[in-house]
Amino acid sequence: MIPTLDEAATVADSVRAARAALPDPEVIVVDAGSGDGTAAAAAATGASVLSAPGTRAEAMNRGAAAATGDVLLFLHADTLLPAGAGAAIAAALARAGAGAFRIGFDRPRPLLERAINARSRIFRIVYGDQALFASRRAFDRVGGYRPLPIMEDRDLAARLRRSGGLVLVPLAVTTSARRHRSDGHARTIARNWLIQLLYTLRVPPERLARRYPPAR
């Protein structure tokens, strides 16, 4: 499942990388009403395209409901799966109900990548740009994504981890550092870590979303 809003510049590459990395995947793009041709760009790759205005959580639940497979993978439109992803996912799901990938950026940032991957490895805290995946049974058992306006990915990962375990696979996705480029590296890191800290301190996601509107 790939949720999108105005991602015409990246969605085709994401779909192509998924097709190359996974054995015969069912690719579903769930679009929130893009005005830049995202839906057409996705359809041109052969992906199924659904329309689902609303939050990213709602989009991913819509995609999961439409999917026919036993394994669900949630992929950001600016994130590329690595070669060998299919085998890595199968190995992870033989051990646990869910998993995620390590992270790498399209413009390498070694210190940040090491910090994020250490956090994921030690605490099993993962986010949507790490291509979270789960067996359908595990996803359904925890009730899918909760209707949160922000931090929906961390919330789902935590519930999956508690329910049936979550494995960090030894491969890295490549995700765009475009926000670092547009907003500045230091500012982006500070903003992200502040949101994570406030969420950990149980500040309601609705309040966080009002203060820090999420990218769709």
Predicted feature descriptions by range:
Residues 97-107, 116-137, 141:
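A recurrent flexible, glycine/aromatic-enriched loop bordering the glycosyltransferase active site
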Residues 6-20:
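Short, well-formed alpha-helical segments that are part of the catalytic scaffolds
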Residues 72:
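Short aromatic/hydrophobic "clamp" motif used to bind/position activated sugar donors
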Residues 51-67:
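Glycine-rich, basic loop-to-helix element that forms the pyrophosphate-binding segment
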Residues 9-13, 36-45, 84:
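Acidic helix N-cap motif at the loop->helix transition within catalytic regions
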Residues 83-111:
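Conserved donor NDP-sugar-binding/catalytic core segment of glycosyltransferases
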